[in-house]
Amino acid sequence: MKRIKQLIVVMFSIFIFFDASGQQSEWEQLFNGKDLTGWNVICQPKDAEKKIWVVEDGAISCNTLNMKGHNHVWLVSEREFSNFELHLKFQAFTESPGNSGIQFRARFDTNLDGGWMNGPQVDIHPPKSMNWRTGLIYDETFEEKRWVFPSLPNWDMERKYEPKEHIFKYAEDGDGWNELILICNGMQVKTIVNGIVRTDWDATGVLDNEHHKKRNVGEKGHFALQLHNGDNLKIKYKDIQIKEFK
């Protein structure tokens, strides 16, 4: 019964966004399951030969558990998007202490700290003690670098923000694929993780503020799968598809 209620909430939430969006395009696959066509790795020159983002068994895979000394490495969509509904699946591993995420409406700036990916990010946090952060929004824009949903002054987040209900699966659990939906329509941003709404946010005054306009992000840009500087991370992504709102 609980699962049925979750599905009803998801369908109703998506319907509201669709109703306000006007016409929609058809579903498109952003990852073909075979190679990284349509995606580019962006990193420091010293990391270029490390093959951090690869395709294995029909999924995009990142495994740096035994790798030292890497900087930030992003896998970035060639295309830009503004208003859309994005669906994907990700698989996390209990042995992975690192953090990942999906930046959206993002853009790389070569002039910042040797290169920086500006833009908001849907957080994906595998460590069990904080996996409830998954689906919340952290802003990687250079002048922000803070949680924007919930709105906090920096990267720190106390357990009082932990929801009463959340679902996070691991590969070790068997069917360990998590389902994530990201919907952006104007300044309305919604995330749904495994059938549970995690973010329902009016980003007016944030994603369209002077910092985001300066970096040309927040309203339109690329997707970027993220590996943090020095993180030991093991994660996989697959079934990445999108429907744009016209």
Question: Residue ranges of each PLM-predicted region?
Answer:
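Carbohydrate-interacting regions of secretory-pathway proteins
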Residues: G22-K246
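Bacterial Sec-dependent N-terminal signal peptides
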Residues: M1-Q24
